Amino acid sequence: MPVPANPPKMSAPIDAVQVRDFFSRPARIAPSDFLRREVSARMHERLELVKITPLRVLDAGCGPGADLAQLHKDYPAAQIIGLDAAQAMMQAARAPASKLAGLNQFLSKLLPAKAGVDLLCGDLGDLPLAPNSIDLVWSNLALHWHAQPDRVFAEWRRALRLDGLLMFSCFGPDTFREVRDAFAEADLYPHALPFVDMHDFGDMLVETGFSTPVLDMEIITVTYDTAEKLLADVRAFGGNPLTTRRRGLMGKAAWQRMLAALEKMRRPDGKLGL
């Protein structure tokens, strides 16, 4: 199916180099991995309801490879391809992938397809893959870091076979709302991404050639005792890669106004929610 040629749509003025540099230090994002694991578990629950037997699976934005083993377990006959734009993430992903090496060799003798896990470094919007070569695209909390999601969807559609399946998750417009509101009390700079609404994603999917897209929303609230821990997790989730972000440190008075605004948002149980 041909992909319509539409002008690219910017989700936000995201600095791709900043994103890649941030995720090139896996230790910085490790404290936030609890959320990716929770979302991954919920995605796998949904995927279990779909009866498919893929031969090639792409984990787009695989990070340090936490989802590769589960995908390999779910589809032992498939070749699992992990792709990420950050070279350091590829190096981190080699550890879980190498644990499957012995099983890969065993399966390759029994199965006609190339079973196992392979790793690629590349952009979500410029896949180093042939057209119609993937049966399942999996992407967990990666899409929102790309400035042109419609371009990413077009690439995923190009790589997928006609009856292929796309399963992805990403942050929505209400994500980090508390942080945006608190910083708005301090200055006029953006301090968090304006994440895309799922209805806009649905339109993009249809425009790029996907049929019958089904999207839904789940709310996950993480609670904190202190504003400092909340802000530390926001940084660990990916920080602020906007080209319009403040350059340099915020003044002490402005920082205190932001903290005071956060404190006003405490819940009845005394916790801060995010």
Which residue ranges define each predicted feature?
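Conserved beta-strand signature within the Rossmann-like core of class I S-adenosyl-L-methionine
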Residues: 163-170
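Conserved alpha-helix/loop element of class I SAM-dependent methyltransferases that forms part
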Residues: 34-55, 66-70
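A short acidic, Gly/Pro-enriched loop at the edge of an enzyme's catalytic core
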Residues: 125-136
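Class I SAM-dependent methyltransferase SAM/SAH-binding core
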Residues: 55-127, 151
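Short, glycine-/aromatic-enriched active-site segment of Class I SAM-dependent methyltransferases
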Residues: 173-192, 202-204, 210-211, 216-218, ...
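A short glycine-rich, Lys/Arg-flanked "PGG" loop and its adjoining helix->strand segment in the class I
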Residues: 150-162
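N-terminal, positively charged/glycine-rich alpha-helical extensions of SAM-dependent methyltransferases
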Residues: 1-31, 36-41
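Conserved Class I S-adenosyl-L-methionine
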Residues: 217-274
